[in-house]
């Protein structure tokens, strides 16, 4: 007989994610240096950047004023975090630092201009509110970025690789095109500034009349069902579009904005409205990008070797001679050697203290054992004396 009152454990039927693949996915944290001291505007930008980095980011992270960047780097390893995006503010500028956790390098940017999500929506005539677009990572599009470094620009490859490694790679052969819902555009201008734009992808079927498109849209959402109370017959609506009012006319779609995808399993409405030839041929979709923010204009200031400072690999405003670079290398070599020496001394001190603690513990144990033996021998002598009496 089964256990009465035993709680039933539901077994999930969907496939579990591969832990190896989960570990390979880049994860990020967007934090404010100094917490609320950066101001309200930069705090809102932090929130918008967290939405942009979804779903593999800490969306509800709460910073404290006492938290330091070193604390986040310490926790990055156990949590699997690969990148830290640190926003800070000085008296004159707002700054963004991208740190490759846990040991660097670090890319330091100056934020010249930025616009929040709410400001971008305010500029649009028909703003679109995202729904399920943040369940999948965005598609990264980079323009005017170099894969190979040169003597004049040794930092180009590192800059490009850093941005690419912040998001999971997309395979053209295996990625489902319907899972790509957002686009993150990074455009490198001639003056070296980087424009960041964030879009959601809106698709619309091509080759289908507007009345049929309205009916297909109404099948998914009741509020989109067209009003047919003025139409005598459904054919008047399908053939002539009677009953459609207040909608803007469709603009002509460019060929570059039209793609063909494999048609999924048709719905009942599609089977009734579309012909057999239309159901068999690939489905054409018109793609439109709708900006949702945030916007940023970044300038790369410098690149450092470590997560917390270290050797300066590149600086946009400071140019050193070969002799100065050699002196800098010698200084960092001495600092690294001194750091390793101190670490060895600390490890040796910890080992010695543990050995001393263990030795004292063993001596204490031996002392208790010897005292117990003496007590036992004394008890035996007293018992023998009592027997002779």
From Swiss-Prot:
Residues 323-350 have a biased composition (Basic and acidic residues). This is Brix domain-containing protein C1B9.03c. Residues 351-362 have a biased composition (Basic residues). Transmembrane segments: none annotated. GO terms for cellular component: nucleolus; preribosome, large subunit precursor. GO terms for molecular function: rRNA binding. Keywords: Phosphoprotein. It comes from Schizosaccharomyces pombe (strain 972 / ATCC 24843) (Fission yeast). The modification Phosphoserine is found at residue 377. InterPro entries: Brix, PPAN-like.
């Amino acid at each position: 007989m089964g256990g009465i009152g035993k709680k039933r454990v539901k077994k999930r039927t969907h496939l579990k994610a591969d832990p190896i693949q989960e570990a390979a996915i880049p994860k990020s944290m967007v934090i404010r240096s100094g917490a609320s001291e950066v101001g309200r505007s930069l705090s809102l930008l932090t929130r918008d950047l967290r939405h942009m980095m979804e779903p593999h980011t800490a969306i509800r992270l709460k910073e404290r004023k006492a938290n330091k960047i070193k604390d986040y780097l310490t926790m990055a390893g156990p949590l699997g975090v690969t990148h830290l995006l640190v926003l800070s503010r000085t008296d004159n500028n707002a700054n963004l630092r991208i740190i490759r956790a846990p040991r660097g390098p670090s890319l330091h940017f100056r934020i010249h201009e930025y616009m929040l999500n709410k400001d971008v929506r305010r500029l649009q005539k028909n703003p679109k509110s995202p729904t399920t677009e943040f369940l999948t990572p965005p598609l990264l599009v980079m323009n005017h970025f170099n894969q190979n470094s040169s003597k004049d620009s040794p930092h180009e490859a590192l800059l490009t690789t850093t941005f690419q490694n912040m998001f999971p790679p997309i395979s053209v052969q295996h990625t489902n095109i319907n899972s790509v819902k957002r686009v993150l555009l990074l455009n490198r201008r001639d003056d070296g500034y980087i424009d960041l734009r964030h879009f959601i992808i809106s698709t619309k079927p091509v080759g289908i009349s507007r009345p049929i498109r309205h009916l297909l849209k109404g099948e998914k959402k009741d509020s989109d069902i067209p009003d047919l109370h003025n139409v005598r017959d459904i054919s008047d609506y399908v053939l002539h579009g009677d009953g459609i009012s207040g909608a803007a006319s469709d603009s002509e779609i460019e060929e570059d904005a039209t793609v063909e995808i494999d048609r999924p399993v048709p719905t009942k409405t599609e089977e009734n409205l579309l012909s057999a030839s239309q159901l068999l041929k690939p489905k054409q979709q018109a793609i439109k990008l709708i900006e949702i923010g945030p916007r940023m204009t970044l300038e790369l200031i410098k690149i450092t070797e470590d997560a917390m400072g270290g050797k300066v690999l590149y600086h946009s405003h400071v140019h050193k001679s070969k002799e100065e670079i050699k002196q800098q290398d010698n200084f960092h070599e001495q600092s690294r050697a001194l750091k390793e020496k101190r670490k060895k001394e600390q490890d040796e001190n910890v080992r010695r203290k543990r050995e001393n603690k263990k030795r004292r513990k063993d001596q204490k144990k031996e002392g208790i054992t010897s005292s117990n033996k003496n007590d036992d021998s004394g008890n035996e002598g007293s018992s023998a004396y009592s027997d002779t009496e």
